[in-house]
Amino acid sequence: MKRILISRTDSIGDVALTLPMCQALRSKYPEAEIIFIGKNYTRPLVKCFKAIDDFWDIDELFNQPITSQLEQLKADCIIHVFPNKKLAFLAKKAKIPVRIGTSHRVFHLFTCNMRPNFTRKNSNLHESQLNFHLLAPLGVTEIPSFQQIQELVQFQVAPTELPSWIPTSNDSRIILHPKSKGSALEWPLEKYMELALQLAESGKTVCFTGTEQEGTQFRHLLPVHDRIIDTTGKLSLDQLICFISQSNALVACSTGPYHIAGLSGIHAIGLFSMRRPIDPGRWRAIGPKAEYLVFDQTCQSCKKGTHCTCIENIEVSTVLELIG
């Protein structure tokens, strides 16, 4: 294998949990060129993956003339981690010899010649482990344990200049990231505000992060305190990654910044429901200091798979205790 393409064109958290399989490929094929195809906004995250040689923006690829697309897609193998119908047909047209995709997509029957049969929805495996099923056709047949997954991570944050108004001391800086763009069940905003105030009054610097749109949903609720800072809408992803890596801890639900914090090696605290398939068994962050909280490990509503708001019952005091 001289050139391997890995396609994961969804969100930051999903891309973050693709890192271990990239590292496994690097170990299996140390001389291969490994290229990641994704949404352009995830580029800064992928740049931190030491196993990846290059990043291609899928929209930029599709905007090229078809002849240029086919020329660019010259490779020995493509792995469709997140199925994309247009890319799957394009990869076949480009005559990539090994085209790997799950058997659970009808269009893969016509576009992929290697179709591992596995299901994500009802699996007990972590998302990062599930991705390894796609490596079986390449000779990586063992699914690593979650502990082994932790050891596979090689994440290197590039130094990035941060705005001058960002506090420089990081030993007492806690990041709170309340929103998730609707991708996860969220802890109540009022509890984030209570947590922020208690942390600030104990001498911590509290920074709220999120997009500008997310900031408009809670900015007016922020307690007035010298140690509580609103950064929403003010940081690029490059800056956010660097900012997180230089902080002491981060609290969020199951969303991208939680996974960035875990990979960065800081104390990452994720707030979860136990309902599958959005439970921490599937989506907890990878990292030496990554942890998670649920209200009730045995929640019956979650076990039944019904809509449950038990995450809202996680106490502020419990989160404070875990922050330490």
Language-model features: where?
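Catalytic machinery of carbohydrate-active enzymes
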Residues: 1-324
